């Protein structure tokens, strides 16, 4: 079991210290894991064999199209419907499926390793999940249970008094993902807090976009990648290190959606590991200069 030395409360208080915060934001499916989380146990448990997993998604997408429905709401509805007569979809059940999810090599220890590297260089690292997948499944992973993430933003169910999923509580799609970057920027993490719309001076932003890293794998990450890129941050496209299909990251690179790409290999010394550590060192150096700028600016305005 990995012990996380920096808890969420301490991490959130770090903005009040002299240590700059670097927010690392991740998609989940095919970014931290090789496949969709639902396809790693749940879909099979409702009667689809390995050869029929694509059929589940096709039926879900057809449901969305037929009813002018959000694709994520459609798959959540279908999950509940397909489970009828088989088992109850409870938070605990979904967390069990999440615990079965296969992770890319190195992911299991990545978050604390990078956090410790940041602290060694005077940078507080916070890890965020921004995913269209299921929050309950992500919460079932070992690293989530151990406190790796400052916040998990993902689609989620509402549960009745018996603990059974009855309705979507939150649906995250590729466009509304960007709101969570603004929440992180301003330090307003509660999804119901309307303060995210308030103006915050650049020097008062808790995590300016230049201090964000967004790691994703596909078109659904483009709005977040573009927002981070356009504001001086770092967007990284990842691809499966086994299949080595770079078509998506090449396309994102040509269209200026990402600044870098690397295999989804999270082991110590990998290309991704080296790249992120370079960004951490750059952040540490830049924020010293930025602090001096803010000091001069405030003194001149007094």
What are these regions (language model features)?
Residues 2-161:
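Alpha-helical substrate-recognition element adjacent to the catalytic core
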Residues 105-128, 132-302:
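C-terminal cap/substrate-recognition subdomain and adjoining C-terminal extension
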């Amino acid at each position: 079991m990995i012990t996380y030395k920096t808890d969420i409360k301490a991490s959130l208080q770090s903005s009040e210290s002299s240590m700059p915060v670097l927010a690392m934001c991740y998609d989940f499916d095919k970014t931290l894991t090789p496949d969709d989380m639902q396809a790693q146990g749940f879909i099979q448990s409702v009667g689809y064999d390995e050869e029929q997993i694509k059929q589940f998604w096709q039926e879900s997408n057809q449901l969305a199209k037929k009813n002018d429905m959000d694709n994520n709401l459609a798959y959540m509805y279908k999950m509940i419907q397909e489970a009828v007569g088989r088992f109850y979809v409870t938070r605990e059940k979904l967390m069990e499926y999440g615990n079965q999810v296969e992770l890319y090599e190195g992911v299991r220890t990545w978050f604390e390793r990078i956090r410790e590297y940041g602290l060694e260089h005077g940078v507080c690292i916070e890890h965020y999940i921004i995913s269209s997948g299921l929050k309950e499944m992500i919460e079932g992973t070992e690293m989530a249970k151990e406190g790796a993430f400052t916040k998990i933003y993902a689609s989620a169910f509402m549960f009745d008094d018996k603990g059974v999923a009855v309705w979507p509580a939150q649906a995250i799609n590729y466009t509304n993902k960007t709101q969570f970057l603004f929440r992180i920027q301003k330090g307003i993490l509660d999804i119901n807090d309307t303060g995210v719309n308030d103006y915050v001076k650049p020097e008062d932003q808790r995590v300016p976009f230049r201090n964000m890293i967004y790691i994703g794998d596909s078109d659904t990450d483009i709005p977040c990648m573009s927002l981070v890129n356009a504001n001086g941050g770092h967007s990284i496209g990842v691809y499966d290190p086994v299949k080595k299909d770079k078509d998506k990251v090449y396309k994102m690179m040509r269209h200026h959606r990402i600044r870098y790409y690397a295999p989804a290999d999270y082991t110590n010394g990998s290309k991704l590991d080296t790249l992120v550590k370079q960004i951490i060192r750059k952040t540490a150096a830049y924020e010293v200069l930025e602090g001096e700028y803010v000091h001069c600016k405030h003194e001149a305005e007094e």
